[in-house]
Amino acid sequence: MSQPRPLLSPPETEEQLLAQAQQLSGYTLGELAALAGLVTPENLKRDKGWIGVLLEIWLGASAGSKPEQDFAALGVELKTIPVDSLGRPLETTFVCVAPLTGNSGVTWETSHVRHKLKRVLWIPVEGERSIPLAKRRVGSPLLWSPNEEEDQQLREDWEELMDMIVLGQIERITARHGEYLQIRPKAANAKALTEAIGARGERILTLPRGFYLKKNFTSALLARHFLIQ
């Protein structure tokens, strides 16, 4: 069997993207890094986004950290998801930065969250810390769009959280708010502050926040598609 090669330009169709992702299934991160001419770090402490970057190289992703989807021409977002030996997610999934000001007139339909989750290529990766990073295997990809029920669930969470932001209750939002979608601090250090609306409508400084999918959402999604018991 010939070895796969990284795509040198963005995929032109979903079929091409999925076929390339399927070729990576079963390879270890160390093998894929070596084939792409990259060095595998010992761990992810200093290179938290390394797995995502590696898979972006292999799949010809175009967006980098821009607000558009990773595969902008296809409208597809790439999400790697660390899983345990039973295929269950080990952590929440970052979606996008939560806007804390300038939210008048924003609706679920026009929101950044919905834009990012409209079409997602999920790639499970072994994530248990007992497995050295280079030995962790890439799993089977899943090309997904939210069904009506999932869209409604996410919409309700988004509306509840955005109402709290707009009404100046940002400091009262905890990770427990939202059934499937949560907001929590995004900054790596506590000095990186951003503007938000306070309880009396005044401008305050607070930690940047991000939207994350909770594990119960991604766990059900993976179980349904991969028939995990």
UniProtKB/Swiss-Prot annotation:
Transmembrane segments: none annotated. GO terms for biological process: DNA modification; mismatch repair. The keyword DNA repair applies. CDD domains: MutH-like. Pfam families: MutH. Its main location: cytoplasm. Keywords: Cytoplasm, DNA damage, DNA repair, Endonuclease, Hydrolase, Nuclease. Sequence-specific endonuclease that cleaves unmethylated GATC sequences. It is involved in DNA mismatch repair. Belongs to the MutH family. This is DNA mismatch repair protein MutH. It comes from Escherichia coli O127:H6 (strain E2348/69 / EPEC).
